[in-house]
């Protein structure tokens, strides 16, 4: 079974072989959209036209990945994107920022990216 979003009982579903994959991790979508707006309001617009940003979600494929997801991604007290990462999304602090670079940062979001961030 595959499911979009997470729910109580995910661990049991993976342990029993009922769940093969979960799709989660939607919150960066709002962060990147906000940063595009922030740049425009702050005087460093990334485009003169409306922009489209595409968010790939996390594919959670095991009980171990589910634990990482719940511990780090779903925990409101842990941020995958730290202050430096967020500043890199703001033209005020990153003069080399372009719309393509912002989309590239968004494209990096994956379970591998999450694992890299929690190991810092």
Specify the residue positions occupied by each region the protein language model found.
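Short, glycine-/small-residue-rich phosphate/pyrophosphate-handling segment
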Residues: 24-25
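Extracytoplasmic/secreted envelope proteins and their assembly/folding machinery
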Residues: 11, 31-34, 38
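Generic alpha-helix signal with a bias toward terminal, lower-confidence helices
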Residues: 13, 31, 70-72
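Hinge/cleft segment of the Venus flytrap/periplasmic-binding protein
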Residues: 36-120
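Venus flytrap/periplasmic-binding-protein-like
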Residues: 1-18, 28
């Amino acid at each position: 079974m595959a499911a979009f979003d997470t729910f109580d009982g995910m661990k049991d579903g993976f342990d029993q072989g009922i769940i093969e994959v979960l799709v989660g991790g939607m919150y960066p979508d709002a962060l990147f959209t906000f940063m595009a707006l922030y740049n425009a309001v702050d005087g460093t617009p990334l485009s003169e036209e409306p922009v489209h940003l595409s968010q790939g979600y996390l594919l959670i494929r095991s009980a171990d990945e589910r634990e990482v997801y719940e511990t780090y991604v779903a925990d409101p007290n842990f941020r995958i994107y730290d202050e430096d990462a967020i500043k890199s999304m703001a033209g005020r602090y990153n003069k080399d920022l372009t719309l393509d670079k912002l989309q590239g940062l968004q494209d990096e979001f994956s379970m591998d990216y999450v694992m890299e961030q929690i190991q810092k």
